[in-house]
């Protein structure tokens, strides 16, 4: 079978007239070391939904912004966002086998003012609402009986990264007496370590999450956890709930106390506002807190439909990212939250972005002739300033930086020291980094020279609340989707994980064959890897 990887996409992106304008503009980008002024910092700001996006320290001019807006129009980015939120099939590759389904995660929070009127979106929202009601009744009963105090979630990938990141972000709101534990890695030490922290298995609930009901790592960890309960003389069925699609092996009343549903139109990395996140976040913080989280996500979904670019924060951020990636040729982005509560947030957005847009073919199945998703990485500030910011300031590669920040801290506990509070010191540091990266410094000592022109943007809100956290999630989800729409790629599948799974299963069979000592090897190169383990016998 001939695969058309040798051909490149002939019809879009660099052939847009806006792209040609941007290529010309990129030959002489704005020099931030000369052009950054107080007026520019004041002028280049977009505001919506309680957030301000400060982008005066990006290397853009009004001409660049006009061309970027034109690019979004030529690629029909807003139309595609509307179609996605209406439930049209957006997860597809033309003429090749693909998942061929909607990407309707927005329906899981489309439960408030101005809901979508398209039939598929309404039907999906009603399904999500029914599951939330089922969850409310389940948790209400548990609270009345004060039965389960600890929750263990067994999941992997987006079913783990997203909920876990948002749990840490809201941990200051944890209900008294409640504790949450996470198991994801198939490394048995993950399970063993968690169970050393659980005080009473009798009062422990386990939520197993797998859309397909067959995820190998999750199934393996589930069996390890079930064995812990059996060893304690407890019936796992009375402690286990499942979150899966209807009809999967995990949709089984004989094995689970309760089953909550998700659907094939929700991708794992987009599943935090579905039951994947709802059960754990509602158990930990209460369902009203989760409801506020959904409200924030819904509001940013609506903002993503704004035709005014200066109010459509996700689209503007997407276009700034495309300018940096495709026209200034910066291959990576450091995502730096100046909030310790967001210590796992970059890991989640890393998956949302890189699994969505790490694609080398377009939706016609043709190899792209342009770069797609950047490498996303980072850690919270100010800690990161004392680790990898040296490279960002003086390294040979230009690394754009996206900063998340809040005016106020979470607990309201602070101290004035040497004339300022800790929060003021935090804010001073993040603004200083943006300024230093943009303007640089000239010195007679070359070791103290900073070249500048390192672009940054700052997403700023008053305070991290359940509402703003939901909006923040939607901001990044929609930003990533917009970039995929403009590039013409499928942001909603993840074939890149499949080949490794196939080969891992062959190696697993090789381990099993060696244990049985009955079958000769059918996977010689795999056997060659395993022989290295014999050295440690």
From Swiss-Prot:
CDD domains: SIS_PGI_1, SIS_PGI_2
Positions annotated as active site in the UniProt record: 355, 386, 501
Keyword Ion transport included in the entry's annotation: no
PROSITE patterns referenced in this protein's UniProt entry, alphabetically: P_GLUCOSE_ISOMERASE_2, P_GLUCOSE_ISOMERASE_3
Source species, domain of life: Bacteria
UniProt subcellular location: Cytoplasm
EC number from the UniProt entry: 5.3.1.9
Name of the top EC class for this enzyme: isomerase
Major location category of this protein: cytoplasm
GO cellular component: cytosol
Coiled coil: none
Entry annotated with the keyword Cytoplasm: yes
Keywords for the protein's UniProt record, in alphabetical order: Cytoplasm, Gluconeogenesis, Glycolysis, Isomerase
PANTHER family, A to Z: GLUCOSE-6-PHOSPHATE ISOMERASE
Similarity-based family: Belongs to the GPI family.
UniProt protein name: Glucose-6-phosphate isomerase
UniProt organism field: Protochlamydia amoebophila (strain UWE25)
């Amino acid at each position: 079978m001939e695969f058309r990887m040798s051909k490149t996409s002939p019809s879009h992106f660099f052939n847009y007239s806006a792209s040609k304008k941007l290529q010309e503009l990129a030959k002489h980008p704005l020099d931030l070391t000369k052009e950054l002024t107080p007026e520019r910092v004041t002028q280049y700001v977009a505001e919506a939904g309680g957030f301000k996006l400060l982008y005066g320290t990006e290397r853009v001019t009004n001409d660049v912004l006009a061309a970027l807006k034109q690019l979004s129009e030529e690629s029909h980015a807003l139309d595609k966002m509307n179609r996605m939120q209406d439930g049209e099939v957006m997860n597809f590759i033309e003429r090749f086998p693909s998942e061929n389904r909607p990407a309707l995660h927005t329906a899981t929070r489309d439960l408030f003012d101005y809901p979508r009127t398209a039939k598929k979106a309404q039907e999906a929202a009603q399904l999500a609402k029914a599951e939330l009601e089922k969850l409310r009744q389940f948790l209400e009963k548990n609270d009345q009986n004060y039965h389960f105090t600890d929750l263990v979630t067994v999941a992997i990938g987006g079913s783990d990264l997203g909920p876990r990141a948002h749990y840490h972000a809201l941990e200051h709101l944890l209900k008294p007496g409640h504790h949450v534990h996470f198991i994801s890695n198939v490394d048995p030490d993950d399970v063993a370590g968690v169970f050393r922290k659980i005080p009473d298995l009798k009062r422990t609930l386990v939520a197993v999450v797998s859309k397909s009901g067959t995820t190998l790592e999750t199934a393996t960890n589930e069996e390890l956890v079930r064995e812990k309960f059996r060893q304690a003389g407890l019936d796992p069925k009375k402690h286990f709930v499942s979150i899966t699609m209807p009809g999967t092996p995990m949709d089984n009343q004989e094995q689970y106390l309760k089953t909550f549903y998700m659907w094939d139109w929700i991708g794992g990395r987009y599943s935090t506002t579905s039951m994947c996140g709802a059960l754990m976040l509602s158990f930990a913080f209460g369902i009203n807190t989760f409801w506020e989280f959904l409200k924030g996500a819904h509001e940013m979904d609506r903002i993503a439909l704004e035709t005014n670019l200066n109010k459509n924060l996700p689209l503007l951020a997407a276009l700034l990212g495309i300018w940096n990636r495709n026209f200034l040729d910066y291959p990576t982005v450091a995502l730096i939250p100046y909030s310790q509560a967001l210590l796992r947030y970059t890991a989640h957005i890393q998956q949302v972005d890189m699994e969505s847009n790490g694609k080398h073919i377009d939706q016609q199945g043709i190899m792209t002739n342009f770069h797609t998703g950047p490498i996303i990485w980072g850690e919270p500030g100010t800690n990161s300033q004392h680790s990898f910011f040296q490279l960002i300031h003086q390294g040979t590669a230009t690394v754009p930086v996206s900063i998340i920040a809040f005016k106020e801290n979470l607990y309201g506990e602070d101290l004035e020291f040497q004339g300022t509070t800790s929060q003021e010191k935090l804010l001073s540091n993040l603004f200083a980094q943006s300024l230093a990266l943009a303007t640089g410094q000239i010195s007679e000592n070359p070791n103290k020279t900073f070249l500048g022109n390192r672009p940054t943007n700052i997403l700023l809100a008053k305070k991290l609340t359940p509402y703003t956290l939901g909006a923040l999630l939607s901001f990044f989800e929609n930003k990533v989707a917009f970039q995929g729409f403009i590039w013409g790629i499928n942001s909603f599948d993840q074939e890149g994980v499949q080949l490794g799974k196939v080969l891992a299963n062959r190696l697993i069979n090789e381990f099993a064959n060696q244990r049985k000592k009955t079958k000769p090897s059918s996977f010689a190169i795999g056997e060659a890897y395993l022989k290295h383990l014999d050295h440690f016998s």
